[in-house]
């Protein structure tokens, strides 16, 4: 700050208190001053650098020129792609100013709206996905009803009977989707509330396995449960933990060929309890593992719809795990199977 007067230093100190990033350019569009927030975001050595080397955004650079030429404040959206996506609302104010008295200088105020942008995009994508997921069964139901009402099946009871299972299947698919959406919405609203009930994880898992007894037998799958202790006590929400293990065991069954095994193990590590659910199924390609807990993400959409998946099950699992302050790790290899490892803090 050796080149600034006492008044200018006080102005800089004031700007340092702002959460927004403030960058001041001289007439050559080089940075002559930046506040602490800007240094923290874009680097400690900003002074002397060209603005184009710090923020590579064509709209911003064009707006700086416009602000200088028209001597008017310009407001523009700025997107930074690397190293991480950032979204700013930039206000570009033409100089001169107290901190740079050159005629063609400008002050840039950057308001970080990255999280707002992500939330809006998330909502937009979510609505689009829900619309798409509902449209397919609705079209099937509409087509079936039109055929019964106006087509060749109008007076043909046998033909009508053929359409009824299809209508019931698609109605059930919609019902499951809506149920999962409501469940996910409720979990997200309450995710910050940590459960306080003392529960035995092993008892919950045995309960879920018992519920799946018939489908396990039908698919000729065996379940191997190992646990060194009789009880594994954590603080949890019983119904939601049942939902977690229902989703994971259900997936293990659906994506495993007949005659295979599902391995479930529980280990108490003093401060935490680890549950592993491993199958010998089709596995997940490595490039998709990090995405499978995203809403509506499917590795194989055709297979998922064939087995009745909504694409929301693992998203529900992730949010319930978060609510329990637990961690989830996923390991998988194509053709060999998938393992979900959940680590819960002990009560």
Regions found by a protein language model. Give the residues of each.
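Sensory modules in modular signal-transduction proteins
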Residues: 2-38
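PAS-family sensory/regulatory modules and their coupling/dimerization elements
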Residues: 50-115
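Short alpha-helical segment of the dimerization/phosphotransfer core of two-component systems
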Residues: 169-174
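Conserved micro-motifs of the catalytic ATP-binding
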Residues: 189-194, 233-236
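Short conserved segments within the C-terminal catalytic ATPase subdomain
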Residues: 215-225
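Short conserved segment of the HATPase_c
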Residues: 284-296
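Conserved glycine-rich
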Residues: 325-326
């Amino acid at each position: 700050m050796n080149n600034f007067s006492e008044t200018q230093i006080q102005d800089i100190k004031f700007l340092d208190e702002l959460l927004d990033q403030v960058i001041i350019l001289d007439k050559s569009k080089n940075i002559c001053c930046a506040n602490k927030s800007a240094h923290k975001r874009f680097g400690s050595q900003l002074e002397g650098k060209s603005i184009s080397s710090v923020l590579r955004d064509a709209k911003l650079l064009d707006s700086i020129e416009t602000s200088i030429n028209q001597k008017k404040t310009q407001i523009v959206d700025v997107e930074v792609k690397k190293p991480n996506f950032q979204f700013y609302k930039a206000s570009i104010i033409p100089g001169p100013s107290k901190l740079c008295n050159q005629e063609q200088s400008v002050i840039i105020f950057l308001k970080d709206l990255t999280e707002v942008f992500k939330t809006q995009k998330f909502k937009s994508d979510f609505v689009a996905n829900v619309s798409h997921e509902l449209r397919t069964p609705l079209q099937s139901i509409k087509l079936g009803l039109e055929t019964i009402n106006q087509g060749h099946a109008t007076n043909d009871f046998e033909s009508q009977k053929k359409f009824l299972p299809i209508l019931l299947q698609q109605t059930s698919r919609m019902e499951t989707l809506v149920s999962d959406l409501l469940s996910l919405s409720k979990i997200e609203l309450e995710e910050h509330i940590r459960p306080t009930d003392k529960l035995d994880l092993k008892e919950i898992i045995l309960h879920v396995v018992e519920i799946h007894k018939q489908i396990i037998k039908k698919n000729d799958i065996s379940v191997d449960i190992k646990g060194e202790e009789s009880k594994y006590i954590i603080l949890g929400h019983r119904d939601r933990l049942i939902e977690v293990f229902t989703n994971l065991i259900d997936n293990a069954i659906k994506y495993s060929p007949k005659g295979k095994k599902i391995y479930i193990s529980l280990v108490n590590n003093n401060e935490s309890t680890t549950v592993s659910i491993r199958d010998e199924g089709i596995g997940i390609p490595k490039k998709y593992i990090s995405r499978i807990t995203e809403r509506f993400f499917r590795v194989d959409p055709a297979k998922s719809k064939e087995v009745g998946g909504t694409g929301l099950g693992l998203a529900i699992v992730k949010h319930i795990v978060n609510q329990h302050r637990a961690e989830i790790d996923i390991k998988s290899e194509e053709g060999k199977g998938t393992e979900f490892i959940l680590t819960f803090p002990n009560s």
